[in-house]
């Protein structure tokens, strides 16, 4: 369990620190280009969830994310699985969720600043930006979710297979 909270704390600290730096350096600027036509830092405030979609009022989002985070921590705590493949994804999702929840509680919105500029332009007469501006917490949640999918069979072994092998 210490490994879980250590990893989650690292995500939260990195997320909050980079957001503070983004506010200090980027808030008054348009963007800072790191790799032309690909990667830049652009300050943005997000009232919604993924891709800026507004899902619910701030208070509901805080309650929802807080509940999900608590359930993740309880699930990890109650599980006997202490492998890296189990702990790492859940710690990333938990840390990312808490990092963004801190923003919602303290400022009412999430600070985003990493901008992968894949394509901005017209598609079928509509202006689109094909990649959202995001932050460290969003990255941790996404990576954690991908790891859960990737390692699903080792994290959650099929119980019916175990029961069948126990009978023989």
Curated annotation (Swiss-Prot):
The biological pathway it contributes to is:
Protein modification; lipoprotein biosynthesis (signal peptide cleavage)
Quote the catalytic activity from the record: Release of signal peptides from bacterial membrane prolipoproteins. Hydrolyzes -Xaa-Yaa-Zaa-|-(S,diacylglyceryl)Cys-, in which Xaa is hydrophobic (preferably Leu), and Yaa (Ala or Ser) and Zaa (Gly or Ala) have small, neutral side chains
Q: Topologically, how does it sit relative to the membrane? A: Multi-pass membrane protein
Signal peptide from the UniProt entry:
none
GO CC, one annotated term: plasma membrane
Coarse class of the protein's main subcellular location: membrane
A GO term for molecular function:
aspartic-type endopeptidase activity
Name of the protein in its database record: Lipoprotein signal peptidase
Organism of derivation = Chlorobium phaeobacteroides (strain DSM 266 / SMG 266 / 2430)
Gene name in the database record: lspA
